[in-house]
A protein has these predicted regions:
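A short alpha-helical cap/connector motif
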Residues: 1-122
Length: 122
């Protein structure tokens, strides 16, 4: 649930991924700022950590993968080989919760469950 660990895990998983495979990441859409703190907050009934920051680093730097977050269960990120338009971010300064909240649809490529199912069937 910590950005640096998730970033390492995702990078390693991509090296092993079958060309037609997919990686599913949990906890990419924290419901409030307390959920995304690096240690579990007493103000939140759950914890996503800052997983979303690792996801965003790949959205901002990897054109060779396709990514979206399905709007369910604190955000399920789906990563597979393909292409994506990079999100323009200052990785040192932009990755704060308020920015995520304002830009989550664009930044995460956030899709509904129904839209995701349509993509799979299409």
């Amino acid at each position: 649930h910590l950005c640096e660990d998730v970033e390492k895990d995702l990078g390693n998983a991509l090296q092993c991924l079958n060309p037609n495979g997919a990686i599913v990441m949990h906890d990419c859409l924290p419901p409030n700022q307390y959920y995304q703190e690096r240690t579990q907050s007493p103000h939140a009934s759950g914890w996503t950590g800052d997983t979303w920051k690792a996801y965003m680093k790949f959205r901002a730097t990897r054109e060779d993968i396709e990514m979206c977050v399905v709007d369910t269960d604190y955000g399920c990120g789906v990563v597979r080989y393909g292409t994506q338009e990079l999100v323009q971010l200052d990785l040192e300064n932009d990755l704060i919760y308020d920015n995520l909240e304002k830009n989550k649809v664009e930044w995460l490529n956030l899709v509904s469950v129904d839209n995701f199912v349509e993509r799979l069937q299409g």
